[in-house]
Swiss-Prot record:
The N-terminal region contains the highly conserved SGGXDS motif, predicted to be a P-loop motif involved in ATP binding. GO terms for cellular component: cytoplasm. The gene is tilS. It is found in: Cytoplasm. It comes from Xanthomonas axonopodis pv. citri (strain 306). Its EC number is 6.3.4.19. This is tRNA(Ile)-lysidine synthase. The lineage of its organism: Bacteria, Pseudomonadati, Pseudomonadota, Gammaproteobacteria, Lysobacterales. One of its GO terms (biological process) is tRNA modification.
Length: 440
């Protein structure tokens, strides 16, 4: 997009002449976001496209109310609508106060963002250099060293950092030239926080020796982003070749890849499923499963409400469903979908108004059930029939069993008795069991 220079100062931050869409500014009241607010408010095109601001009130400082009031006055003066959101920061989350506040803030951003809106953050080049150093000290690979992206999908819109290429000194000069007023949060100078320590102690020392240190670190972040993008293209091209028809990872196909590529394919597979990033110790644990050729292993690695399970020489990614209460049961006539305790659903598909002659009993598997299949004169153990299906064991455990009196009629829609099958065919109907993941 074509850029225009901000008025008054040469070298001040640049904004695209044409807004990418409606903008929601994350406005803390600090110097950085105050400059971005002033720049955006000075652009008629941005106002016309839709411009508003959001201030997150963390309630962690005695002056938090005064900061919110300052933000309101500033936005009123610039005629920019402001939304103030109060959040509860979990002090006992185990993440630390800084990380917990960031999580609460991002949750507020995600909730406030309207579909198609661009969430503008006021990060600059010095922030990028700090992030690069922090990631390097955590032994990050190219994805981590890419630090902050200029833009990326976020919630129902796009996260946007329009000033990422510009130095903090440029922003400060702009703020002084326009006589802006801003908030100085004392927590931003507390050296107990890693980022503040880098900002106040490490980077000034580096810049004494290497005056272009900040520029060089930010450039390294960009080069890492370029490398990461190329690697990701390769990963996504290779990924279909190691997947089964059901989307599981084929261990035999993975073994044909190098160790380094396998690690990347594992992460790409998890990312493609919109699951939380796979941690390094998770990659190591799954690498052991790839190297283990035993056919009967049933290993599992879990993190952040996600699991990778091994079964039949494949790795499956799934989100564990809620357990069924042992005594749960329901009467179901098929007229409406039946919501199951784990979020799954049972449906009777057919003509409008179709229902069973008598309500059926639906409950979880108890063990020992037997069922008479179509065109069979004797019953089979349900357990043995389920084992013969290409259905992972954790899915079998969640199958609802339908009963009519003492007779088992079905296990989900996977196994249907002769009696129920005949009724379904006579009524041009079908039984459908959808897991929580399918239902969503």
């Amino acid at each position: 997009m074509r850029c225009e220079v901000a008025p008054v100062l040469t070298g001040t931050p640049l904004l695209p002449a044409t807004p990418p869409g409606p903008v929601l500014l994350a406005y803390s009241g600090g110097m950085d976001s105050s400059v971005l607010l002033h720049l955006l408010a000075a652009r008629p095109r941005y106002r016309h496209a839709g411009l508003r601001a959001l201030h997150v009130h963390h309630g962690l400082h005695a002056d938090a109310d005064a900061w919110a009031a300052h933000c309101q006055r500033t936005c009123d003066a610039l005629q920019v609508p402001l939304q103030i959101v109060r959040v509860q920061v979990a002090r006992d989350s185990g993440l630390g106060l800084e990380a917990a506040a960031r999580n609460a803030r991002h949750a507020a951003f995600a909730q406030a963002l309207i579909a198609g809106e661009w969430l503008a953050l006021a990060h600059h080049r010095d922030d990028q250099a700090e992030t690069f150093l922090l990631r390097a000290l955590r032994a990050s690979g190219p994805e981590g060293l890419a630090a902050m992206r200029p833009q990326r999908p976020f919630a129902s819109g796009t996260l946007w950092r329009p000033m990422l290429a510009h130095a903090r000194a440029d922003l400060l000069a702009y703020a002084h030239a326009h006589r802006l007023r801003w908030i100085d949060d004392p927590s931003n100078t507390d050296p107990r926080h890693d980022r503040n320590f880098l900002r106040s102690q490490v980077l000034p020392l580096l810049q004494q020796r290497w005056p272009q240190a900040t520029d060089a670190l930010a450039r390294s972040a960009q080069l890492s982003a370029d490398a990461s993008a190329l690697l990701l293209q390769q990963d996504m091209a290779l990924l279909p070749g190691v997947l089964t028809a059901s989307g599981a990872l084929d261990l035999q196909a993975l073994r044909a890849q190098s160790v380094e590529r396998r690690a990347r394919l594992l992460r790409a597979w998890v990312s493609a499923a919109h699951a939380p990033p796979l941690p390094a110790h998770g990659v190591a644990a799954l690498e052991q499963e790839i190297d283990n050729h035993a056919a009967d292993r049933h290993a599992c690695f879990a993190w952040q409400q996600v699991e990778v399970r091994r079964w039949r020489q494949c790795l499956f990614l799934h989100r564990p469903a809620a357990a069924w209460p042992s005594d749960w049961h329901a009467q179901w006539d098929g007229a409406a979908p039946l919501q199951l305790p784990d979020g799954a659903q049972l449906r009777l598909l057919g003509a409008p108004g179709l229902r069973f002659a008598q309500p059926l009993l639906v409950r979880a598997r108890q063990g020992g059930e037997r069922i008479v299949l179509p065109q069979r004169g004797h019953s089979h153990q349900l357990k043995h029939l389920l084992q013969a299906l290409d259905l992972p064991p954790w899915e079998r455990e969640r199958l609802p069993v339908l009963w009519e009196g003492a007779q088992v009629l079905a296990a989900g829609d996977c196994i249907i008795s002769g009696t129920l099958d005949a009724w379904l065919q006579a009524n041009a109907a079908a039984l459908q069991w959808r897991t929580a993941a399918d239902a969503n």
